[in-house]
């Protein structure tokens, strides 16, 4: 059982919901990434999603696009991202870390080389936005052989066939994108999310995390009632954008602690 699987199983056994915050590696500054990772855990995160900066992040809204631009301007590469995970692992060997990004940086490195380097760094899974499950069977299999989980996206427009492909090739959890659009968009319809997740669960036996559009404790709590975990990204990046550099880590920890409290009530 992978670290992601055991974490989510332990939460389910306690009737608790997973909290999965997202930050972009290297934003707002490379030296803050590892302190932010630890602060998110201290605030109650169960799994961390670390975004790999990319110049054309097509699924992201303007907030995460800006985060990618800032990280790239600091020269953050895939090598650096794996270095952040290695540094984090020196003092935390229990919280799963998922890398989220796009195929290009992985292809540049080479799939096998990336997987071995990610395993050595202490990565637990990947979400590659432009790797549909039916096109990356070998990548998914190699990840699993190395005790990492290939995590795939599902959306309101996913076909039955796509859902079955995710059930076949995915592991760890499935990531349901709650909105038609980009990250950070507004107004989640929790009734619609509940209906879609019920349809997905006919095929997918993995835990389901929901992201895109979760901006506050009330929305997180509502979404958690129909899912296994909530993913929050753009709202955290906004907190970083609006915080003086010296207060950024503390403010993010306070924000995520508020979400944790709401999920546990």
UniProtKB/Swiss-Prot annotation:
Pathway: Amino-acid biosynthesis; L-tryptophan biosynthesis; L-tryptophan from chorismate: step 5/5. The active site is at residues 49, 60. InterPro entries: Aldolase_TIM (IPR013785), RibuloseP-bd_barrel (IPR011060), Trp_synthase_alpha_AS (IPR018204), Trp_synthase_suA (IPR002028). The keyword Lyase applies. Pfam families: Trp_syntA. Its EC number is 4.2.1.20. GO terms for molecular function: tryptophan synthase activity. It catalyses: (1S,2R)-1-C-(indol-3-yl)glycerol 3-phosphate + L-serine = D-glyceraldehyde 3-phosphate + L-tryptophan + H2O. Keywords: Amino-acid biosynthesis, Aromatic amino acid biosynthesis, Lyase, Tryptophan biosynthesis. One of its GO terms (cellular component) is cytosol. Belongs to the TrpA family. The alpha subunit is responsible for the aldol cleavage of indoleglycerol phosphate to indole and glyceraldehyde 3-phosphate. Tetramer of two alpha and two beta chains. This is Tryptophan synthase alpha chain. It comes from Janthinobacterium sp. (strain Marseille). The lineage of its organism: Bacteria, Pseudomonadati, Pseudomonadota, Betaproteobacteria, Burkholderiales.
């Amino acid at each position: 059982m992978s670290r992601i699987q055991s974490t989510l199983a332990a939460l389910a056994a306690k009737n608790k919901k997973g909290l999965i915050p997202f930050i972009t590696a290297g934003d707002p500054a490379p030296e803050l990434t590892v302190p932010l990772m630890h602060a998110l855990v201290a605030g109650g995160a169960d799994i961390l999603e670390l975004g790999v900066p990319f110049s054309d992040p097509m699924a992201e809204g303007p907030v995460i696009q800006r985060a990618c631009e800032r990280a790239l301007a600091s020269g953050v590469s895939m090598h650096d991202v794996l270095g952040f995970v290695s540094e984090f692992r020196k003092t935390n060997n229990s919280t799963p870390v998922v890398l989220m990004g796009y195929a290009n940086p992985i292809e540049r490195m080479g799939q096998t080389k990336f997987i071995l380097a990610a395993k050595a760094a202490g990565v637990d899974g990947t979400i590659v936005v432009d790797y549909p499950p039916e096109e990356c069977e070998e990548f998914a299999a190699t990840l699993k052989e190395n005790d990492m989980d290939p995590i795939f996206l599902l959306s309101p427009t996913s076909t039955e066939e796509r859902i079955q492909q995710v059930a076949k090739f995915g592991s760890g959890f499935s990531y349901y994108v709650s909105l038609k659009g980009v990250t950070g968009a507004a107004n989640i319809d929790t009734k619609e999310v509940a209906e879609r997740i019920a349809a997905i669960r006919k095929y997918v036996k993995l835990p389901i995390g929901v992201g895109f559009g979760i901006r506050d404790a009330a929305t997180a709590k509502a979404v958690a009632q129909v899912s296994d975990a909530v993913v929050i990204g753009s709202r955290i990046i906004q907190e970083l954008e609006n915080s003086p550099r010296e207060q950024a880590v503390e403010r993010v920890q306070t924000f995520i602690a508020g979400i944790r409290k709401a999920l546990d009530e």
